[in-house]
Amino acid sequence: MFKLTTKFHVFVFLFLGIFAFSQEKKQFPNVSGLLQRIIPNMKIDSWLLIHKSYGKDNVLKQVGRVKDYTSPSSGFNIGIAEEDEFYYIVYSAGGKTEYVTNPEELKKFIGKADDVQEAAVLAAADGYIIDEEFKDMAGNYSEDKSNYYLDLGKLTSKECPYQKKHYTLTVNKVSGIITEVKDNGAYIELYNKKCTNNPRLLKIEKKEEPKDDPKKKPSRSRR
């Protein structure tokens, strides 16, 4: 009986340990590191992943040799980027040089998500972001036997307020499809001085509203 009880306790302990491990949240690498892990879902001869910042190209990953390509003037981003900063992919297939410069082309290049990193990149191509400054909120994931659970952000308003919300996306491991999206609310909400809808200013204005003086009762004249 003692041996049976001991075995049962060990089984429960191991089960809970495996469950806790599967639910443990892990942070994604930075955006450039995440993009370097993607694998093309098409037959290509060679390809380059390039980060372009202020007109300067920086090759982040090279598979084979791509000849005779021109640096484009625009590309894609999957995080919060500077104004003159983007990524692009150049690949060679069937003797032709092709480019990936927008989210739709990026999704086609990756195809179905083969792992959690590709799932995050595909979600970002649909408008979500990996927020490198707030990975605890919008740049981490957990998983179980059936699904990935991605905590990602989204820029929902650029001014009055500047707002970012974070979401939990459930991605099926087999299909690579997002099956559920949970809105966890705003984690960044900033108002500048020009915002007339700033809640704090509205509260101050409400407090400063002058109260109407009570009407003075007419004094009775003495006879």
Segment roles from a protein language model:
Residues K211-R223:
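Long, low-complexity, intrinsically disordered segments
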Residues A81, V90-A93, V100-T101, S142-D144, ...:
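A structural detector for beta-sheet-dominated domains
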Residues L202-K206:
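Extracellular/mature segments of secreted proteins
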Residues E118-Y167:
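Acidic, glycine-rich flexible loop segments
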Residues M1-K25:
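Bacterial Sec-dependent N-terminal signal peptides
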Residues V181-C195:
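Short, solvent-exposed aromatic-acidic interface loops
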Residues Y162-V181:
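A short, surface-exposed beta-strand/turn
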Residues K25-E132:
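Extended, low-hydrophobicity segments enriched in charged/polar residues
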